[in-house]
């Protein structure tokens, strides 16, 4: 398979150079409906589990996309005269699973040393990424985002409970339950919208 090489090391990459599904810019959704929009169904169907799950980078990008001050501000603030609640739905299909040999947003962890000290093992990387995840969750909530957590086929963790706004934490063991949970979330957002 492919390899990566540095002056000090060469390592077969195996499945550690995954290209995740690209983010999707905000799209207008019918908040009066309890059905999951077709574009969400299609997007979710295209997701593939590759391992090396990083909750922190997912939350960082979710918050960046929804921030009124962030790189997507023009999209977020396109109708400033409307008082819209903003919701971030964070779904994961795996427990936090950093891998020091995985190519990620900040390079290959064992060589880049941007998250933890060099040669930190996979298990010892978890507290670093957990702390970053919680900090990203705090930042998202400080941006007045309502954070919903969905655990798909994986256990709900203390980090997920910490991150969610209130008790907005959901579990789904299969796609039928996942669709049901998204319908529940959609109906609650619609109720919030109608009540404001």
Describe each PLM feature range.
Residues 1-196:
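P/S/T/G-enriched low-complexity
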């Amino acid at each position: 398979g492919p390899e990566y090489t540095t002056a000090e090391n060469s390592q077969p990459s195996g499945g550690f150079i995954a290209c995740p599904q690209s983010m999707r810019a905000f799209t207008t959704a019918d908040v009066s409906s309890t059905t999951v929009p077709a574009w969400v169904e299609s997007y979710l169907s295209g997701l593939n589990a590759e391992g090396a799950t990083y909750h922190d980078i997912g939350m960082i990008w979710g918050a960046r996309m929804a921030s009124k001050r962030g790189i997507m501000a023009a999209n977020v603030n396109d109708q400033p005269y409307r008082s819209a609640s903003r919701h971030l739905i964070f779904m994961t299909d795996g427990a936090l699973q950093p891998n020091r040999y995985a190519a990620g947003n900040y390079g290959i962890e064992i060589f880049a040393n941007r998250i933890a000290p060099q040669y930190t093992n996979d298990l010892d990387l978890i507290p670093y990424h957990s702390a970053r995840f919680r900090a990203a969750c705090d930042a998202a909530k400080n941006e007045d985002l309502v954070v919903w957590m969905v655990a798909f086929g994986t256990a709900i963790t203390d980090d997920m409970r910490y991150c969610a706004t209130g008790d907005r934490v959901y579990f789904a063991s299969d796609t039928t339950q996942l669709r049901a949970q998204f319908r529940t979330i959609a109906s609650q957002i619609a109720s919030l919208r109608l009540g404001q």
